[in-house]
């Protein structure tokens, strides 16, 4: 509370205004003492002087005090007995002005602000206020010390609230008790959540299905019970001797079904009664505390139900059930210094409930709000364009380099080429296959245009390195190539195309697979192979040897036995022509 002096003469022994201002009215810890994060406390000490003031010091104290006390009732043997214990568990002091021991200082007239701040650990006890002699409180005390006059003192309470985290199970799990009383009734009593905000209401859902013909439902009583477990010395293992337990009824709701409440169909299977009751919590902490367990003060709540069953034979049975409930203080509902809610309207309470519902994590059934893959922007992804075929390999993964003018392939690295460049090169390759290359173009010029090194094919001379274009089977991997050291695309030699070939007889068409066993037996004796004349850029004429073709075809492993087999198959193919 601010201290203000408006004396007529403005004596030098008085301060015009002295107050403690906090940036936040209360400190909020989310979660238990073992999991809550630290909180920052800051504020200012305000001092206004109309005339100079002589002081010894200006200090600010923050103190945490816990007190546990109970009264035992008096008996015929003697009077009542009181047990109590008070301790200071937290202290912090800020010294703003300290002239020195035994010295004084004169503050000129004016306005003064002294800021202060501190980090409070999340394990600090929360404020417990509402009981007469039992509490946990925090108090600020600011004092201006004077040498020959009374000190100027101002005090201000600090409230620390410990609330639930948005992911706490108490906020998402419903509490229910349901069972069947044989030949009596089937019942279900539930609450939407276990945790309830202080100052709001508790909704209780009832479902009662009579199993005995003629059974009627009588009075239904719902009670909110608060239990107190007080311990003088909680750190002492023998504290069971200094423990006091007490209970009090917070809410007592009595309800009877009207004659208009006829049986209704429940769950499309049975007839019964289904209704809800709302239990309004008190708006002051003096009548209802929050759930807590700190500094020897343990507060718990539970709901107790009693349902009267009027049997057809006239006797009355009673159904009893209990549900646990947890009450916590919400930061959205402010509490004044007298422990009462500042705003007690139903709209404010409903707003606090709605804010809490928005903080809770989404349920599993709400996964349809997740972003779908189809909604992502594909721009920038390395995906071949629409013009590229589904089986088009990347440059570094291709077995054969394209027969197009790609001088940039010499600088090809381990990274794949872009989709647009690949599409452009494939289009140029498709166009180049429809035009015949000039027969006068030399092999060395073609190899240099494609960026193939001259020593790639090994020692060669004249036209002995010429061969026809590899058929589709040339894409098979060669067993003679060490793929661990040869980059992809260079494991198969490149063979240029030659369009004009002079042959006395039609050139046999190479087969893609070996002949059938029956055909091999029916083939007559092989004849000597024919010779074909091939135009060359280096020589006017040369001989085309089928063995050279098989020798340079990629994909056939070397070996003497394999060489004879290939000769036999080629001669058998020529004999069928």
Curated annotation (Swiss-Prot):
GO terms for cellular component: cytosol; plasma membrane. Residues 428-447, 460-472, 528-544 have a biased composition (Polar residues). One of its GO terms (molecular function) is ubiquitin protein ligase binding. SMART domains: Arrestin_C. Residues 473-486 have a biased composition (Basic and acidic residues). Keywords: Ubl conjugation pathway. InterPro entries: Arrestin-like_C, Arrestin-like_N, Arrestin_C-like, Arrestin_domain-protein, Ig_E-set. Interacts with hulA. Belongs to the arrestin family. Component of the regulatory network controlling carbon source utilization through ubiquitination and deubiquitination involving creA, creB, creC, creD and acrB. May be involved in signaling by recognizing appropriately phosphorylated substrates via its arrestin domains and then recruit a HECT-type ubiquitin ligase such as hulA, leading to ubiquitination of the substrate, providing a link between ubiquitination and phosphorylation in protein regulation and stability. This is Probable HECT-type ubiquitin ligase-interacting protein creD. The gene is creD.
